[in-house]
Amino acid sequence: MQMKATILIVLVALFMIQQSEAGWFGKAFRSVSNFYKKHKTYIHAGLSAATLLGDMTDEEFQEFMQDIEQAREEELLSRQ
């Protein structure tokens, strides 16, 4: 009898843990989903930029970074 009670308690505990984890997973999924819906334009732009940068050779990437640095310096000079 004591063994059956122990097994029952363990099964109930496992069920409660499973339910609480399922609730946590659902909340996390909704949170990520809401974040994506709010920021999908920026996410797509970031993925496009990452794809373009990933396809560049090292020399093209260095030129790209130099162009960005030059544009930043020109912007700083124009503010002065």
Curated annotation (Swiss-Prot):
GO cellular component, one term: extracellular region
Subcellular localization(s) per the UniProt record: Secreted
Modification sites for Leucine amide: 53
GO biological process, one term: defense response to bacterium
Signal peptide: 1-22
Propeptide boundaries: 55-80
Principal subcellular localization: secreted
A Pfam family the protein falls into: Styelin
Keywords carried by this UniProt record: Amidation, Antibiotic, Antimicrobial, Bromination, Secreted, Signal
Modified residues (6'-bromotryptophan): 24
Presence of keyword Secreted: yes
Purpose of the protein: Bactericidal against several Gram-positive and Gram-negative bacteria.
Name of the featured protein: Styelin-C
